[in-house]
């Protein structure tokens, strides 16, 4: 009986651990299929033989058969006949231009690759969160162990492109409509914000898509009095593919960790939208200090992020752990109070979406 019980225990243990193993196998195959556009060459309707698919994608038939067997077994692909493959609803979402395909690639580069260095990283730095932006798992994984996130992106153009695409898409995922009332800015622009001062400065605003959404919902804000501050290479990219609605916006190259250009002083609003969670505490304090130094008495600083709550779901926790790879961290309302205070600012209001953890934390001069 003891032997039988032991066998059952081993099987149960392997079944539990094996589930993680199989998830990794599936993820790895998905990444290969996405990289080589295998899903794109399967007809949206009907089926294709593995041999024909291998010819179209310049793949070895035997390897493609092994990989596709797994995706059929996991119901990602269908096999209407032996050695035939067809799409399912799931697999259609992994074609090149689909969001899911981009997400898989993003997770691989910004989470799985750095995660593979965790053993070495924690052995060297101790079992603690990154405290220095230039000592991060992502740097270790990409062969740039002394670079921060943006130093890595500067040396890895492909990763930079993927990161910027993800940042741009996040504007649509977390719309601000109805969350924060910009009506006060209308009166401020008319009464006491000087004509030479910006209405809104979007710090880390990338291609300006979040600002575009904001201006569409608040047409009283003159676009010519708005600015985006981001790294010079990001600004250059943005200006090469500028949306027509953003032609009047000023795109300025720079860093939030350095003194802000004079043209950005005394703005009505300084906005950090899904930016600060990518940074370690000391850099957030420095960025807020740089803004505080150029604030006018009427200026407001908006931090737009997901707030950590005790009730957050598994996916939100996963995102928090993922940004650890480049020194980032999701933070609670109490965390923002503390960071603002250390930068000489104070939290005035917190506006939250009831259905998500998305919030606007409004700061002013202390």
UniProtKB/Swiss-Prot annotation:
SS bonds (residue pairs): none
Stored InterPro entries: COMT-like (IPR016461), O_MeTrfase_dom (IPR001077), SAM-dependent_MTases_sf (IPR029063), WH-like_DNA-bd_sf (IPR036388), WH_DNA-bd_sf (IPR036390)
Pathway: Secondary metabolite biosynthesis
Keywords recorded for this protein, A-Z: Methyltransferase, S-adenosyl-L-methionine, Transferase
Protein residues bound to S-adenosyl-L-methionine: 204-205, 230, 255-256, 273-274
One Pfam match: Methyltransf_2
GO MF annotation terms: O-methyltransferase activity
Disruption phenotype annotation: Impairs the production of phomasetin but accumulates N-desmethylphomasetin.
Superkingdom: Eukaryota
Gene3D superfamilies: Vaccinia Virus protein VP39, Winged helix-like DNA-binding domain superfamily/Winged helix DNA-binding domain
E.C. no: 2.1.1.-
An individual GO BP term: secondary metabolite biosynthetic process
Similarity comment text for this entry: Belongs to the class I-like SAM-binding methyltransferase superfamily. Cation-independent O-methyltransferase family.
Function comment: Methyltransferase; part of the gene cluster that mediates the biosynthesis of the trans-fused decalin-containing tetramic acid phomasetin, the stereochemical opposite of the HIV-1 integrase inhibitor equisetin. The PKS module of phm1 together with the enoylreductase phm4 catalyze the formation of the polyketide unit which is then conjugated to L-serine by the condensation domain of the phm1 NRPS module. Activity of the Dieckmann cyclase domain (RED) of phm1 results in release of the Dieckmann product intermediate.
Protein name: Methyltransferase phm5
Organism: Pyrenochaetopsis sp
Gene: phm5
């Amino acid at each position: 009986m003891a032997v039988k019980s032991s066998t059952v225990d081993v099987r149960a243990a392997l079944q539990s651990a094996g589930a993680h193993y199989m998830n990794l196998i599936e993820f790895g195959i998905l990444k290969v299929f996405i990289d080589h556009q295998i899903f794109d060459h399967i007809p949206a309707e009907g089926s294709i033989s593995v041999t024909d698919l291998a010819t179209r994608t310049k793949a070895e038939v035997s390897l493609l058969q092994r990989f596709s067997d797994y995706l059929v077994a996991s119901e990602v692909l269908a096999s209407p006949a032996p050695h035939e493959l067809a799409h399912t609803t799931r697999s259609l979402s992994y074609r090149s231009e689909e969001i899911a395909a981009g997400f898989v690639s993003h997770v691989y580069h910004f989470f799985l690759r750095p995660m593979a260095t965790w053993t070495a990283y924690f052995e060297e730095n101790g079992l603690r969160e990154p405290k220095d932006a230039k000592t991060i798992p992502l740097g270790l994984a990409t062969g740039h162990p002394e670079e921060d996130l943006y130093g890595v992106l500067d040396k890895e153009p492909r990763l930079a492109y993927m990161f910027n695409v993800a940042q741009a898409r996040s504007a649509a995922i977390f719309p601000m409509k109805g969350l924060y009332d910009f009506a006060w800015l209308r009166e401020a622009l008319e009464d006491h914000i000087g004509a030479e001062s910006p209405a809104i400065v979007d710090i880390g605003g990338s291609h300006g898509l979040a600002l575009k959404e904001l201006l569409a919902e608040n047409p009283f804000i003159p676009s010519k009095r708005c600015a985006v501050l981001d790294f010079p290479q990001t600004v250059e990219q943005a200006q090469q593919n500028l949306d027509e609605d953003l032609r009047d916006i000023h795109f300025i190259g720079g860093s939030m960790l350095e003194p802000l250009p004079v043209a950005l002083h005394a703005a009505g609003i300084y906005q950090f939208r899904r930016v600060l969670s990518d940074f370690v505490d000391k850099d957030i304090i420095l960025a807020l200090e740089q803004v505080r130094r150029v604030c006018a008495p009427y200026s407001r600083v908006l931090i737009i992020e997901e707030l950590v709550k005790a009730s957050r779901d598994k996916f939100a926790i996963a995102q928090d752990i993922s940004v650890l790879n480049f020194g980032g961290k999701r933070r609670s309302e109490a965390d923002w109070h503390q960071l603002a205070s250390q930068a000489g600012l104070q939290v005035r209001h917190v506006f939250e979406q009831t259905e998500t953890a998305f919030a606007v934390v409004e700061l002013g001069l202390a």
